[in-house]
Every structure is written in structure tokens, then in C-alpha cells.
Amino acid sequence: MEKRILTDVERIERNERIARAYYAAYDKKAVKDGATYADWVYASHATYWSPYFGNGMIDLETNPISVEDSATMEALSYSIEFKDWGPIDFECYPSVNGVAWKTHFGAHRKSDDVFMDFFAYSYVHTNEYGEITHWETHVNSDYNDFLDVAIGEHGPYRESADDYMRAVMTKSPTTGSAGGLISALPG
């Protein structure tokens, strides 16, 4: 199928759907609300980067990261220590060239009902076809305290995101793929 250059309006709408699909994955409304990940299409040589998770570029063409799979693995792991983990608030800002969003996550600890929260920020750049060319994620410092409770350790994971995903998968009651994140970073 031949690619078609999208109009500015189509690009903005698609970029908003990209952000809302991310939110739906974490809010577990994907099926109920009819959200899909069809708009999460990576361009050739697309990259992912986060200073917290490895601080290196991941080639998304050869190591695609599934938002749905990653959200599932984190939710399973985090729910062992937290009874109601998920997004509290979500804001997205679509534009012609991409979308930025802020997600406020939080939960009550099962052990003592203390509420813990953190913020995550994502930036996705897209091309004229609406394909993702670059995606990055940032978290605030409260994420460290949250992870200490949720998985027993925190980053930043400077060498590789593998250590984070191993901790998540070790804590998880199930095993499985983390959507290509493990071993995706050089190191």
C-alpha cells in the first residue's frame, strides 16, 4: 500500500490518537472505549530515548516497543504492592509534527494505604505520513520512591533498560515479553 501525505488536520488528529492510545493502555479502557494502537506506526529508523531508562537510543524499527505490552507488564508488577495503580490525570497537546503528554500516575500502598504518585512526560515526533520518528519519556523524581515500593529498586538505569524490565518481570506474577524493551538498548 502506498503511503499518503496527511493534511495538517489529519496529522493533528492522528497525533492525538497516539497519545490517547497510550493513556488507554494504562487506564485499561482500550477495549471498552474502542481504542486501538493502529496509529502507533514507526517510521523507518524511528528511535526511542529516555534518560531514566538506559539513556541510549533504541531503534524502533528493529526493536519495536509495544505500549500495550509494556503497560500490562508494569500494571501486573505494580499491582502487587499497590491496590489501585493507574493514571490519575492525563493531558495531551497534539500538533502537526507530533504530540506531548503528561500523565499523573498514583496508587495506594496495600500495606498501609499511603498514597504515592509521580509524573511521566512523553514526546512523540511524527513525519508527514503520521509515522512515529522519535519517542521519548521522562519521569519526575517521585518515581524513585514509587519504584522502591513497587519493584524493590529504582533507577535511573543508565547502562541499560534491561535492568528495569528484569525487575518488573521478576516482580510480575506472570512471565512474558515486555514488548521488545529488554535487550533493545546497546550496552
Predicted regions and their residues:
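C-terminal and inter-domain tail/linker signature
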Residues: M1-G187
